[in-house]
Amino acid sequence: MIRIQAVNKKNELEKNITHERLKAEWEGYKWFWVDFDQPTEEETAELDKTFHFHPLAIEDCVVKLQRPKMDYYEDYSFFVTHSLNHINEDKQEINFFIGSNYIVSYHHELSKEMNDVWERLSLSKKINKWDPYLVMYHIIDKIVDNYFPIVYQLEDRLSLIEDNPNDETMEELLEKLFDIRHHLLQIRYTVIPMRDLIYRVINSHRLKGVKERYEYFADIHDHLLKLTEMIDGNRELTTDIRDSYLSINSHQTNRVMRVLTVITTIFMPLTFIAGIYGMNFENMPELTWKYGYFETLFLMFIIALGMFWWFKKKGWFR
């Protein structure tokens, strides 16, 4: 679907303009916005037929999930941005062509950000303040704002792992921890390129519309910096929690091994004594002693008790 809104020379917004009318009255508009919303192949062909955009830029629109970037052409600029679905974190590409008096947006899937800004422009009572760069600002601002709920949700999940209110096992907690870390990494792969893109945008000498609204685009960059810090901070927190759990697990294992070591050590001399008297020699004087059995048991008991006292004194049972 191709939908069009245009502002005429009287600063009046005209809605639901047909593609044919736009081509016929091109010069009669102050500026216009053409949105290629889930376009067909025939509609995509209009990027070349009507607007004569560069083949490489058109190819970037058709081929999904290019890296966020900005390219300059003779009389327009091309942008690739990425939005994230806050429910399933699916990545969606939204492209822009911006000229002196138009913005052309292109996206393969339904875009909530695009629809929100489209509706905002439709209902605006200050049309004279709008232009293609303000449209782009609002769309990118919406895209970036929608990153935050995803990161906040992961932060909440991380807090639950820290508190462990359901007394889950360490294996379950570590599995959830690695899942959160994976999601943070995926979001980072989106946020970092977008941050670099906006940095290029606000420092560009060719985008006059951005210079006029520098504070707005700089604010988006600040949000992306904040997101980067939040993501990196949470990734470090996942590492700290993982290390803490592994340290606790290692400590518990060491305590078990210490107890087993004490038991084994205590039984070593007892096993040695039992082994001696278990040998099948005929001439063993102790075997003929009247109280040899009880004396041997007493000796083994004293040895075990003495070793137990020694280990306890050394703090092995703490």
At which residue positions do the language-model features occur?
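Hydrophobic alpha-helical transmembrane segments and their immediately adjacent juxtamembrane loops
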Residues: 52, 222-318
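Non-transmembrane, extramembrane segments of multi-pass ion/lipid transporters
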Residues: 167-168, 211, 236, 271
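Peripheral, non-transmembrane regulatory/ligand-interaction domains of membrane transport proteins
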Residues: 1-210, 216-219, 223-230, 316-318
